Amino acid sequence: MRFAERALPLIALLLLGGCSTLSGTVQAVKDAVVTPVANAIAPANAASAPAVTAGEPAKKAEPVVLAPVDPNAQRAYDNALRALRAGRHDEAEKALKALTQSHPDLGGPHANLGILYRQAGKLPESVAALEKAVAASPQQALFHNQLGISQRAAGQFQKARTAYERAIELDANYAAPVLNLGILNDLYLADNARALELYDRYMAMTGGKDAAVAKWATELKNRKPDKLLTKKEQS
């Protein structure tokens, strides 16, 4: 049996409210590090920002009219991000929990809390937090992708498929859930044809530069189940 353990980078692209334009340079961080979200915040009913895949140039986003945001919430969120980046996870968790209670309509704190829980091995808590993130910001593809990762880790494979498919529906140019859905079909749903289709799609989206994914696709084409690979979802 194959396991999803290949170390692919997480991308720091999640938004606090799940709906503003992405700010700053896209920064890839190793999946051993909790991924902080971007600083921009907005209420859950605004439109989702387009996601940017690692290696792609950022595309100009359509302007979005944002409702005023509580400056105290932004300040608290910035402090939580600083704690995450500094590795002070207990402090970050406390701050994020406080934000989810004072501003439950903002998806970002829920999403960050879910990532923090997942990396601490608290999968039920991670899934619950990320479900709240997508409920607060249902148009944010990145939150759905993160939810799928936690659901897959928790053994909720059909729910993970739904989450990845929703992320793809929301942003057809977002490559990470395409790969994650391919891995899910390959390793857990036993749908080789669908997995191969998704691997090929991912490689087309990313310029075919991922040698490991190309190898997985070749294995499926050649029907060599004895060749075991380890794989890891992308954020």
In which residue ranges do the predicted regions lie?
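Terminal, low-structured helical/coil segments at or just beyond the last alpha-helical repeat
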Residues: Q27-A28, L187-S235
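Helix-start (N-cap) detector for alpha-helical repeat units in TPR-like alpha-solenoids
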Residues: A73, G107-G108, A141-L142, A175-A176, ...
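Position-specific recognition of the canonical hydrophobic site in helix A of tetratricopeptide repeat
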Residues: L84, A111, R118, N145, ...
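Structural marker of alpha-solenoid helical repeat scaffolds
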Residues: S102, A136, L170-D171, A204-T206
